[in-house]
Amino acid sequence: AEKEKLGYSICDVEHAGPYCMMAEALAMANGNPTMIGYLTGTNFGRGFPKYVREFNANFLALPAMPSSIVPNAASDAAIVVRRIDTEKDGSWLAVVNTSMEPKTSRIKCDGTEVKHAVNGKPQPMTNGQFELTLYPFQLKSFHIDR
């Protein structure tokens, strides 16, 4: 007689540190996600909550509306800038580092006042640009007043 199978086993793993947000960051850079879902085989506890919380706070600070890539908005090609325009509430920028390395980039912006979308703090600007340093696969969101 055949031995009974002992059940089902699965192992879910994630990349270490900021690299744990690679899938989410690339989805944000290349599309218009309005939800984030995970396919896991068991309970899902993130090993690097600092990066997950930072990403989620910035993701949730953006309106769930279509965005478009702003060509050449960042001085570094690995930084993708997506823009969401509204009729009444200004615009939002989603700035994503798609690189495996930390990056510093100048971001072009046509607004007169730019604020961090998560906390409302002003982002210093010079001549229609601001400088931003991002760790690998980091998302930062900004609101532009009009």
Question: Which residues does each PLM region occupy?
Answer:
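Hydrophobic beta-strand residues in large extracellular and virion-surface proteins
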Residues: 81, 95, 107, 114, ...
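C-terminal beta-strand-rich structural cap/linker in extracellular carbohydrate-active enzymes
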Residues: 126-146
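Short loop/turn positions at the edges of beta-strands in beta-sheet-rich folds
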Residues: 87, 99, 111, 136-138
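Beta-strand-rich binding/interaction modules
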Residues: 102-122
